[in-house]
């Protein structure tokens, strides 16, 4: 519609933006319609006031040819791979830097998503989904399980004070595979000891098949090969419909936008495993998993 206002002799159109999407008028102005526009690309490497150390960290972490570096450093449009599960463009549109979830569109629950580190370089991450607003509440490396349980209890109590109008349960969806079982057991003990009746501990084995004892479970099991894929699909759907606001955290955005998927031999969608991502030189998607758990 805006192009229709340019019929006047001296009318001009100025567009400024981050090149996150590979569609739309802004993308066309730099590609198929480039002859109609005078395009300027700002490369952060050539800007004096930009912290060059941050640029090098991004390159080291995600690779100089990654979409994260292309968009956030070079000012270039992403070369979106067909097998990436959640496109960078839709994640950016829900970033708290650009988007604020309307108060009348809040989700009716508060959930803590807890992803427990498996190895020394992995992170233990606690994400809080407070009625649709996702925020990192704790990030730890090399922390023992009891300290992680203490983090969860502290965040639970903090959340009750921050949201006095919310009277429902506060769910803790915790990665119960491997080391996570110890945190689950301790949380159940503390809940009983301190009579934390609004604390609902939900152990999740993300590697398991989807339970089919409900209608929703049966429908999900027709499309997704395991619980991890289903959780990420739910997160993707919320992002696509702008039903959540995701904290503007570079690591979270990168992890969400680089995880791939495939069609398994049974015809169902299956998301890339953590070990497969590490073989590609990527970090374990701890933040992405915690966000999906929440």
What spans do the regions from the language model cover?
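Well-ordered alpha-helical segments embedded in enzymatic catalytic cores
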Residues: 1, 125, 147-155, 289
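Mg2+-dependent endonuclease catalytic cores in nucleic-acid-processing enzymes, primarily RNase H-like
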Residues: 22-25, 130-268
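ASCE P-loop NTPase helicase motor core
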Residues: 1-65, 183-203
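Gly/Thr-rich phosphate-binding beta-strand-loop-beta motif of the actin/hexokinase/Hsp70
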Residues: 105-130
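A short alpha/beta connector and helix-capping loop motif
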Residues: 5-17, 123-132, 176
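ATPase catalytic-site recognition across NTP-hydrolyzing enzymes
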Residues: 47-114
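Charge-patterned, long linear interaction tracts outside catalytic cores
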Residues: 113-114, 247-294
């Amino acid at each position: 519609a805006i192009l229709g206002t340019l019929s006047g002799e001296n009318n001009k159109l100025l567009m400024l933006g981050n090149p996150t999407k590979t569609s739309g008028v802004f993308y066309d102005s730099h590609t198929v319609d480039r002859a109609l526009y005078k395009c300027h690309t700002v490369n952060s490497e050539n800007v004096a006031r930009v912290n060059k150390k941050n640029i090098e960290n991004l390159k080291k972490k995600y690779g100089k040819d990654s979409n994260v570096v292309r968009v956030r450093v070079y000012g270039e449009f992403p070369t979106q791979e067909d097998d990436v599960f959640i496109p960078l463009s839709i994640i950016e549109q829900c970033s708290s830097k650009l988007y604020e979830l309307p108060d009348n569109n809040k989700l009716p629950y508060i959930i803590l998503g807890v992803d427990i580190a498996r190895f020394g370089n992995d992170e233990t991450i606690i994400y809080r989904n407070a009625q649709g607003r996702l925020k990192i509440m704790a990030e730890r490396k090399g922390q023992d399980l009891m300290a992680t349980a203490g983090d969860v209890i502290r965040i639970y109590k903090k959340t009750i004070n921050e949201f006095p109008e919310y009277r429902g349960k506060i769910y803790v969806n915790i990665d119960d595979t491997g080391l996570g079982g110890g945190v689950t057991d301790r949380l159940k003990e503390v809940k009983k000891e301190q009579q934390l009746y609004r604390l609902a501990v939900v152990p999740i084995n993300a590697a398991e098949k989807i339970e089919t004892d409900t209608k929703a479970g049966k429908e999900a099991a027709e499309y997704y090969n395991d619980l991890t894929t289903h959780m990420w699909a739910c997160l993707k759907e919320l992002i696509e419909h702008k039903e959540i606001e995701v904290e503007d955290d570079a690591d979270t955005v990168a992890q969400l936008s680089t995880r791939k998927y495939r069609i398994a031999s049974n015809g169902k969608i299956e998301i890339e495993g953590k070990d497969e991502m590490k073989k590609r030189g990527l970090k374990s998607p701890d933040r992405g998993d915690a966000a999906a758990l929440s």
